[in-house]
Amino acid sequence: MLRTFETNYLREVTELSSSLWEFSPNEGEFQGNVYPVWVPCCWENLPDFSAYRGTGSFRKEFEAEGNVRLVFKGVSHTATVLVDGKEVGSHYNAYTPFSVMLKDLEPGVHKLEVIADNRFSEKSALHVPNDYMSYGGISRGVAMEELEGAYIEYIHAVPERTEKGWNVKLAVKVVNLEDAEKIVELQVAVDGLFEITKEVNLKAGEEALVEETVDAGTPDVWEMDHPVLYTICAVLSDADGAFDDLASHLL
C-alpha cells in the first residue's frame, strides 16, 4: 500500500511494489547472481549483502500502453531508471519521491530496471563516510499511473487562520501531455467546506500552476484529542467528462 487512503478514483494506478522483483549486484563476488526480493527492499537485508557498497539492479515487468508515469517514493540513495533497456530518468536523494514519464508507450509487456547506488562519491553531498548507514535499494513504494492527455501533478494546500475563520492557499499543477493546446476544467473541493472551478488553458506539452486563496469558513481544527482530517480532491474534466483526479488530506 502506497498510502493509507485512496489518492485516485479516476486515474488508473497500479502498485508495482509490494511484490517480488529480481535483484542482481552489478559488482563484487556475487555479480550477476539473481535473487528474488520483496520490494520495498534494501539489499543490506540479504545475508550476502549486509555491507555491500556499490550498484544493484532491480527488475520487474509491467504491462501498459499510452501515457505512463512511473512514480518512485524513494530509492537509496541514487537511482537510474531504464525501460526496455533505455535510460528514461535518474534521481539523487533517498528520501524524496520522483517520477518518470513515458509518453506514447507501445502496448505490451515492458521491462523496468532500477539501478540503485549507495556508493560514496563527490556527487553524493550527503552520503559520505559517517556514523550512519547509507542503504542501497528501492526503499519505498513504486506505482504505475496510466494517464490521459493531461493530469494533475500535485495539490499544495496551506491552511491559514484569519480573524473570521480559515483560508486555504491552493496551488495545483496541471500538465498537458498532448502536442496540441488543451482546455480543461479544474474542480477543487474539500469535504463540504468549499468548492471552486477554474478553466485552464494548457499550451501544447506545457504545464500550468493554478493558484487561489479560498475561504474555508470555520472547520473543525485538528488537535491531539480531536484529530480531524479533511479530504481535498482535484478533478480534471473536458468535453467528454471527468478523466483525472488527485486526492490528499488537509489538516
Regions found by a protein language model. Give the residues of each.
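Accessory beta-strand-rich segments of carbohydrate-active enzymes
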Residues: 3-9, 15, 22-28, 53-151, ...
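Short glycine/proline/serine/threonine-rich loop/turn segments at secondary-structure transition edges
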Residues: 108, 123, 216-231
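Short, solvent-exposed loop/linker segments at the N-terminal edge
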Residues: 159-166
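N-terminal carbohydrate-binding accessory modules
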Residues: 7-8, 233-251
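Short, aromatic- and glycine-rich surface loops/edge beta-strands on solvent-exposed regions
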Residues: 111-114, 226-238
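Beta-strand-rich binding/interaction modules
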Residues: 68, 81-83, 166-202, 208-212
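Exposed aromatic-hydrophobic patches
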Residues: 97-103, 199, 207-216
